[in-house]
């Protein structure tokens, strides 16, 4: 990260064009911990049948984002944190509809690009000045509060933050 800035300040161009791995880390984090656990909903416009089951027009469907984004049919080793899944050379292997932290298709979140920019900018600024470590309660698999509508750690987001004093 420090190779991209000598002043400790990040500009738009750096965040957008130079931090490819940060983009991959952001996408993988959103795959494992989507902000909304079931916010993608759709309503049937017409009656239809799927695998022998009839659905009437107006039926509402909620997409289980958390489960789909961890499904081994779509993601090899789905619980493994692997930012390389989103490397450009792996793009052809991705099943685009299985990744939807901002929804999918023509009705996806209109703020997706802005949210990604803000997430990357915040993470870049954090890692420039701080070292982040998991607290003792967060070692291993992070459990999500199953009653929450948004991704919320079950045992609190305990993080140890250490200022990097010898830099900037």
What residue spans do the PLM features occupy?
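Juxtamembrane membrane-interface segments of multi-pass membrane proteins
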Residues: 1-7
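Conserved cytochrome P450 K-helix E-x-x-R motif and the immediately C-terminal K′/meander segment
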Residues: 8-51, 165-167
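Conserved, non-catalytic sequence blocks in retroelement Pol enzymes and Pol-derived host proteins
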Residues: 12-20, 109-113, 149-151
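Cytochrome P450 heme-binding "Cys pocket" and the immediately downstream C-terminal segment
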Residues: 113-150
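Cytochrome P450 heme-thiolate "Cys pocket" and heme-binding signature region
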Residues: 88-119, 143-147
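Conserved cytochrome P450 K-helix/beta-meander segment immediately N-terminal to the heme-binding cysteine loop
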Residues: 16, 33, 49, 63-90
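C-terminal helix/juxtamembrane-tail motif
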Residues: 60, 150-168
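Hydrophobic, well-ordered secondary-structure elements that form the walls
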Residues: 29, 55-58, 81, 105, ...
């Amino acid at each position: 990260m420090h190779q991209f800035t000598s002043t400790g300040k990040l500009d738009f161009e750096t965040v957008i064009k130079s931090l490819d791995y940060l983009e991959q880390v952001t996408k993988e984090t959103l795959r494992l911990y989507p902000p909304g656990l079931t916010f993608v909903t759709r309503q049937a416009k017409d009656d239809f049948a799927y695998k022998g089951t009839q659905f009437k027009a107006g039926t509402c469907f909620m997409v289980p984002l958390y489960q789909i984004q961890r499904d081994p049919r779509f993601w090899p080793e789905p619980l493994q944190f692997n930012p390389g899944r989103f490397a450009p050379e792996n793009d052809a292997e991705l099943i685009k509809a299985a990744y939807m932290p901002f929804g999918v298709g023509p009705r996806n979140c209109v703020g997706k690009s802005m949210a990604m920019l803000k997430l990357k900018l915040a993470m870049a600024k954090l890692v420039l000045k701080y070292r982040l470590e998991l607290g003792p309660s967060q070692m291993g698999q992070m459990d999500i509060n199953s009653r929450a509508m948004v991704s919320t750690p079950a045992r609190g987001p305990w993080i140890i933050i250490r200022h990097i004093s010898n830099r900037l």
